[in-house]
From Swiss-Prot:
The keyword Secreted applies. Pfam families: CAP. One of its GO terms (cellular component) is extracellular region. It comes from Polistes fuscatus. It comes from the Eukaryota. Belongs to the CRISP family. Venom allergen 5-like subfamily. InterPro entries: Allrgn_V5/Tpx1_CS, CAP_dom, CAP_sf, CRISP-related, V5_allergen-like. This is Venom allergen 5. Residues 47-190 form the SCP domain.
C-alpha cells in the first residue's frame, strides 16, 4: 500500500510520514521500553472485551448514563481484529507522542477512528483495565443527544467503542518503565470510523 496516496481531511498519513518501522523512535529516549505491540493473548482480550461491552450495551444492560440506562441497539456489529489497522496504530504508538492522536490513519477501505489510553503503576496495568477507562465514559452519555461538540471530550472513547457500524479494530501498544513506574500505553484504531458529530452511535431497538 502506498500510504502517501491515502487521503485524509488533514495531515500526512502516519505511515507515509514515519515509515513502516514499529521500532520506538528517538522520541522515546526518556523511557525504558519493555515491549512493543500487544501479545496474541492481548489481541484476543482486546477484541473480546470490546464485543462483550458492545453486546452488553446492545442488549440494554448498561445501566449507567446521564441519564441511564442506555437504550438497547438493533444494529450492533461484532468487531474483528484487523492487522493493517494494528500496524498503523503501532507505527504511531512507537513515536511516543503520549496521548496525542495522529492526523491521518485511514486505509484504502475506510476512514479510521482512534482511542488512546494510558496508565502507570507499581505493577503493569493490564490491557482490559485500559479499555474499561473508555467504557466508564458511558456515565456522562445522554443517548438522545448523540455526539455533540460539548460532550465529545467526555464521551468520545465510549461512543467509538460502541459505534454500531464499526466492524474492525487493530491496536498498537508500548509497555515501558519511567520514574520507577510501569506504564502501559494503548492505541486502538477502528474502521469504519465512528464519532460523527450530530449522529447517534447506534439505532435504538
Amino acid at each position: 500500500v502506498d500510504y502517501c496516496k491515502i487521503k485524509c481531511s488533514s495531515g500526512i498519513h502516519t505511515v507515509c510520514q514515519y515509515g513502516e518501522s514499529t521500532k520506538p523512535s528517538k522520541n522515546c529516549a526518556d523511557k525504558v521500553i519493555k515491549s512493543v505491540g500487544p501479545t496474541e493473548e492481548e489481541k484476543k482480550l482486546i477484541v473480546n472485551e470490546h464485543n462483550r461491552f458492545r453486546q452488553k450495551v446492545a442488549q440494554g444492560l448498561e445501566t449507567r448514563g446521564n441519564p441511564g440506562p442506555q437504550p438497547a441497539a438493533s444494529d450492533m456489529n461484532n468487531l474483528v481484529w484487523n492487522d493493517e489497522l494494528a500496524h498503523i496504530a503501532q507505527v504511531w504508538a512507537s513515536q511516543c507522542q503520549i496521548l496525542v492522536h495522529d492526523k491521518c490513519r485511514n486505509t484504502a477501505k475506510y476512514q479510521v477512528g482512534q482511542n488512546i489510553a494510558y496508565a502507570g503503576g507499581s505493577k503493569l496495568p493490564d490491557v482490559v483495565s485500559l479499555i474499561k477507562l473508555w467504557e466508564n465514559e458511558v456515565k456522562d452519555f445522554n443517548y438522545n443527544k448523540g455526539i455533540t461538540k460539548q460532550n465529545f471530550g467526555k464521551v468520545g472513547h465510549y461512543t467509538q467503542m460502541i459505534w454500531a457500524k464499526t466492524k474492525e479494530i487493530g491496536c498498537g501498544s508500548l509497555k515501558y518503565m519511567k520514574n520507577n513506574m510501569q506504564h502501559h500505553y494503548l492505541i486502538c484504531n477502528y474502521g469504519p470510523a465512528g464519532n460523527y458529530l450530530g449522529q447517534l452511535p447506534y439505532t435504538k431497538k
